[in-house]
Amino acid sequence: MCLKDWLCAFCCLRLGCLEYPKNEKQPLVSGNNNQYKTYAVIDDDERNLWSSPHDLSHTEAVDDRMLQSWIQTRNQLEKDSEEWQKLNYEIYTLRQARREVRARWRRILEDLGFQKEAETLLSVTKQSTISNPKNMKRAMELLVKLSDNTTIFPAGWDLPVRYLYIMDRLICLDAVDDFLNIAQKKYPKTKMDISQ
């Protein structure tokens, strides 16, 4: 900015004397900035709740994809047809099973004294992350142990990855052992459950 421009700006003597050079509105770094966009996509996928951690090949768990597929198929069918009713029943059954599992987890958390925090602890989104990657192995082992020793999950269910995040939170709160003990008392596996 020369002296004339400075004086014009300072005194506001005439309009239009403060036109900025066009190159000032150009980006400082020119060229392809795709490396930043690629990084953001990878970061989102790594934190994606519905896939296995660090697995970039899919974005949802199998049961989520199956549910979405059923819903899309049902929406294309004629309402109240026999096939529509079957799909509607399957969708309802899967959603009800998920609600029951969530309610079991909530009851245990409330028994641990997390009455106000239970919903927050159970809330897992795509932005959720594992607090410490070192906890991942322990959280998975404890989730498998929970599945093997309790009926908190329905028989034949794959372990939902979203509960891995909750186990990680319980590890951070140092409440995971108490959670397992209460779960084993409230939802023990019977001999009949083991034989299935």
Curated annotation (Swiss-Prot):
Membrane-protein topology: Peripheral membrane protein; Lipid-anchor
Subcellular location: Apical cell membrane; Melanosome membrane; Lysosome membrane; Cytoplasmic vesicle membrane
Pfam families cross-referenced by the UniProt entry: MREG
Keyword Acetylation: no
Cellular component terms (Gene Ontology): apical plasma membrane; cytoplasmic vesicle membrane; late endosome membrane; lysosomal membrane; melanosome membrane; organelle membrane
Origin superkingdom: Eukaryota
Biological processes per GO annotation: melanosome localization; melanosome transport; phagosome maturation
Principal location class: membrane
Keyword annotations of the record: Cell membrane, Cytoplasmic vesicle, Lipid-binding, Lipoprotein, Lysosome, Membrane, Transport
GO molecular function, one term: phosphatidylinositol binding
Function per UniProt: Probably functions as a cargo-recognition protein that couples cytoplasmic vesicles to the transport machinery. Contributes to retrograde melanosome transport from the cell periphery to the center. Overexpression causes accumulation of late endosomes and/or lysosomes at the microtubule organising center (MTOC) at the center of the cell. Probably binds cholesterol and requires the presence of cholesterol in membranes to function in microtubule-mediated retrograde organelle transport.
Family: Belongs to the melanoregulin family.
Protein name in UniProt: Melanoregulin
Species this chain originates from: Xenopus tropicalis (Western clawed frog)
